[in-house]
Amino acid sequence: MPNFCAAPNCTRKSTQSDLAFFRFPRDPARCQKWVENCRRADLEDKTPDQLNKHYRLCAKHFETSMICRTSPYRTVLRDNAIPTIFDLTSHLNNPHSRHRKRIKELSEDEIRTLKQKKIEETSEQEQETNTNAQNPSAEAVNQQDANVLPLTLEEKENKEYLKSLFEILVLMGKQNIPLDGHEADEVPEGLFAPDNFQALLECRINSGEEVLRKRFEATAVNTLFCSKTQQRHMLEICESCIREETLREVRDSHFFSIITDDVVDIAGEEHLPVLVRFVDDAHNLREEFVGFLPYEADAEILAVKFHTTITEKWGLNMEYCRGQAYIVSSGFSSKMKVVASRLLEKYPQAVYTLCSSCALNAWLAKSVPVIGVSVALGTIEEVCSFFHRSPQLLLELDSVISVLFQNSEERAKELKEICHSQWTGRHDAFEILVDLLQALVLCLDGIINSDTNVRWNNYIAGRAFVLCSAVTDFDFIVTIVVLKNVLSFTRAFGKNLQGQTSDVFFAASSLTAVLHSLNEVMENIEVYHEFWFEEATNLATKLDIQMKLPGKFRRAQQGNLESQLTSESYYKDTLSVPTVEHIIQELKDIFSEQHLKALKCLSLVPSVMGQLKFNTSEEHHADMYRSDLPNPDTLSAELHCWRIKWKHRGKDIELPSTIYEALHLPDIKFFPNVYALLKVLCILPVMKVENERYENGRKRLKAYLRNTLTDQRSSNLALLNINFDIKHDLDLMVDTYIKLYTNKSELPTINSETIENT
């Protein structure tokens, strides 16, 4: 069997990394010699293919002159190597051994008979080979291009070999199989354990793949067939080729937008997931994942690398970028804002917008530069994740809600449904949290102090204790109450931004009123904060939570007898004022004049046009996109025809209500300027993807991160997994690899590494 040496009385295993193991040769004559010298009768009736696939001999059975170490990492046999060193008698001294291979001593007549049989079989095979060689196919000759030099046999074999390696890597990516099979601390010292890549490679060898078998039949089996460096280079090429398929469509579409998701941990390093939005040839708005960018702590360096990667490495022309959006958690918001501003300086039409997949209130809360807010948001996410760990925890919370809201069954039912969803990303998340807080505290207390009837394991009880301590801290109470009240002014506005196209259009007109309300709050912050603090105090009293200043501040004030600072004034200066100021400024930044002009152009959508009684002025707002139009001089006349078309439509014709519907109109090609404008508006990150089939990039990204352990994540394999349905050209991957590494030592013509323990 492959894990054991096939020689009689030899108990060595191929998992020992300090000793090379070799396959039986597939050459009939050499294989026959190996079998004869082994003196194992049970191997005589097996074919060379079977022996090559299932049996091994360790290096102890070969003269040292037969073993060639071409480098410290490569051990191979010479072409004429024959095993000659065997122990055929030690089993006689231990007749009771249960784990020795049984040996049948062959007589000279038996050996001569077997030799004659093997010679006859070899002769028949040679005759068949000669017959086939005398009748070559004419088609192969005709297919040769006179202007291209034909590949040598070695070059063809090397390309087929590389193609097999790339096939395995693509398979591993699509099926989300990590490269490493075992953790380093799982493998005992001195043992060889193949990684997942090598295991799949050996599987294909044993399944009869000729190219791989020929390449590795003389190579020690307990070696790395493909080094980590080679694997990394091939993975980079796989990633690049798969990404290029998407980027080619983006370039054909011309216009696109860039979106980044929250920073993620890839094998211990922080990365930014990057997605692109574009309209494909079938007029469908698509949002596709194109890769990870290493995150930089310095915002200016991050901005430079972000731009360089997109333009130089990925080959996108940022002159065609019409939108940019960044979904990040609290600690990264300010840095991504620097990235956005640097891109805007170079490309003014790359409008900085909100992303449709993130609620405005959630986005604003994450951007608030107050430590207490960041801590509170993290606690909220942990509480939600805790109760979603198991159905039993959600049922426990449901029962507490039923008791607390027994006089309002409808509200109880509504809250239960909300708790079973990912409610932390909702527009009204803080209102929900304030309503649920008592139920959450009582439920967590119940888990901590559960009686013998309901038992939770130590981990659940421990997490419940930590979370209960966090949500019953007065600092947390004040923070969520202030956020609830401040963000109540933007809730309806944000909800409309994620609504229908007409809702988005009219939301743009309501921004002035929202800012006016927030400015009024800022002017009267003393009064507003007094009400907010009173609400927080009442909630704390209801939950029997002591009202106190944060411990860090109290320790700093020790010995300061002149300090007259109260809890109310402390939270006004450190929480309410900076939060309101930041939200006002953030709304002004995210809804710039260009952004609002773009949203005003949504009156091109026929249903919006109808609500405005066809009295619209798109031409004025569309000036910013004039250079994007195929025939800008005819825009005015074309817009007039577009309005007349829908104003005088038939009674049975409904007005298209979305950009998606308008782009798929059969006669849209007769309105080239309108079509161009709709395409540009469609790719703005603030516009939602109407057809969910084309929003797979983000969903698959979330699924990959959810289903893959942090230390097993790979930025290369992630792209293959997320874009598993994108076609791939193995020949292109092979040609690219040969072009890049043909003169380098890591080209897999020297491909085996023996694992040494130094």
Curated annotation (Swiss-Prot):
SUPFAM superfamilies: Glucocorticoid receptor-like (DNA-binding domain), Ribonuclease H-like. The keyword Zinc-finger applies. Residues 116-141 are annotated as: Disordered. SMART domains: DM3, THAP. The modification Phosphoserine is found at residue 563. GO terms for cellular component: nucleus. One of its GO terms (molecular function) is DNA binding. The keyword Signal does not apply. Disulfide bonds: none annotated. A zinc finger (THAP-type) spans 1-86. Keywords: DNA-binding, Metal-binding, Phosphoprotein, Zinc, Zinc-finger. Upstream regulator of interferon-induced serine/threonine protein kinase R (PKR). May block the PKR-inhibitory function of DNAJC3, resulting in restoration of kinase activity and suppression of cell growth. Interacts with DNAJC3, probably sequestring it. This is 52 kDa repressor of the inhibitor of the protein kinase.
